[in-house]
């Protein structure tokens, strides 16, 4: 009997989709001079597509799912979380060290900055070197809090947990839009708990997917039905089109539906293998890609002018850079993490 859980391979493939979305989102979510694109109703075609490519909820849901799986198997504790977080930070620090050194020559007015700036970036409190890593520390906080979060979820049930997480997230998002975005609150140490609470809904929903997946949501994939494949592809297209056209704060719902359709869709093995490979490298690709596309090598990346070429070049350099850095970080982790 085929497992009804989202497998590790499925999870890696979804992370692969998420990192492909992330590169697209960060490349084309802003207008850049010199890019040759089609314009529709006063907006570039690629900009129209970016709402469907918002990646953060994908990573949060897969993290919530995976950590809850670890929790119910009795392997989620302070020690395992400390190992997980330290490994994450070793990758983060290595990437930062290399690119900040490069930045000292290319953009000396920005790198390395004051001692306070260095401290905030090293800890992840305020990621001014590479703002797109903003959810690193909030994610770490959720990891450390996850045993208590999951314990509460077991006591009050999944639906009550979702309602509670929704209240926290809505409250945090209101405060962010009302006070942080307007500049009333500028202290990153005050912003941090708000940001963390704002991510809670996606994280808890991922854990709920683990609870529900046994019988309620994930269909067994025992046969490769061509008709089901067509239906799933059409559903994904419609869902993504709605996300692009309906500009409302429903990214979490969109991501949840996308994942449900995706894991129930019969897929080609070759496509899955490519996505899984990107998924395995997604952490470092996330950490490096905007150093190339925004902060240090912007003119080189966008110099290819056409969106497809720009995207492929960034994907290429981010992937192969991640191969090298992951190898170095792996060796460092083996020497540092000995518990």
What are these regions (language model features)?
Residues 1-7:
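Short, Lys/Arg-rich, polar N-terminal cytosolic tail immediately upstream
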Residues 20-28, 122, 165-179, 232-245, ...:
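Aromatic-anchored segments of alpha-helical transmembrane domains
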Residues 21-34, 103-105:
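Alpha-helical transmembrane segments of multi-pass membrane proteins
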Residues 44-56, 123-138, 176-205, 239-261, ...:
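Interfacial loop-to-helix transition and helix-capping segments at the boundaries
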Residues 48-60, 69-128, 142, 222-235, ...:
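Transmembrane alpha-helical segments and their boundary/interface "anchor" motifs
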Residues 53, 59-60, 68-72, 99-109, ...:
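Hydrophobic alpha-helical segments with transmembrane-like composition
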Residues 67-75, 148-156, 205-218, 260-270, ...:
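Structural signal for the C-terminal ends of transmembrane alpha-helices
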Residues 101, 124, 235-339:
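Alpha-helical transmembrane segments of multi-pass integral membrane proteins
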């Amino acid at each position: 009997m085929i497992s009804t859980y989202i497998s590790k391979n499925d999870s890696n493939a979804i992370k692969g989709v998420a990192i492909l979305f992330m590169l697209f989102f960060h490349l084309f979510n802003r207008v850049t001079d010199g890019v040759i694109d089609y314009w529709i109703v006063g907006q570039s075609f690629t900009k129209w597509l970016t709402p469907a490519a918002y990646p953060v909820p994908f990573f949060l849901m897969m993290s919530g799912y995976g950590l809850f799986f670890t929790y119910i198997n009795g392997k989620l504790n302070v020690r395992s979380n400390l190992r997980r977080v330290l490994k994450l930070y070793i990758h983060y620090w290595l990437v930062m060290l290399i690119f900040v050194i490069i930045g000292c020559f290319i953009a000396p007015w920005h790198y390395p900055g004051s001692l306070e700036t260095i401290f905030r970036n090293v800890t992840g409190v305020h990621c001014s070197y590479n703002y797109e890593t903003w959810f690193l520390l909030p994610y770490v906080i959720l990891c450390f809090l996850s045993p208590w979060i999951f314990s509460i979820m077991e006591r009050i049930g999944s639906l009550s947990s979702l309602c509670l997480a929704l209240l926290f997230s809505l409250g945090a998002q209101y405060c962010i839009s009302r006070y942080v975005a307007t500049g009333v609150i500028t202290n990153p140490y005050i912003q941090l708990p708000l940001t963390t609470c704002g991510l809670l809904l996606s994280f808890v929903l991922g854990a709920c997917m683990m609870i529900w997946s046994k019988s309620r949501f994930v269909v067994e994939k025992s046969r490769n039905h061509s008709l089901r494949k067509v239906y799933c592809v059409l559903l994904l297209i419609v869902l993504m089109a709605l996300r692009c056209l309906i500009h409302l704060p429903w990214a979490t719902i969109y991501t949840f539906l996308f994942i449900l359709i995706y894991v129930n869709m019969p897929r080609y093995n070759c496509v899955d293998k490519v996505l899984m490979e990107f998924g395995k490298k997604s952490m470092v690709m996330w950490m490096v890609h905007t150093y190339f596309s925004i902060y240090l090598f912007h003119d080189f990346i966008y110099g290819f002018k056409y969106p497809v070429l720009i995207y492929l070049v960034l994907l290429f350099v981010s992937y192969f850079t991640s191969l090298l850095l992951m190898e170095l970080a792996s060796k460092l982790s083996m020497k540092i993490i000995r518990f």
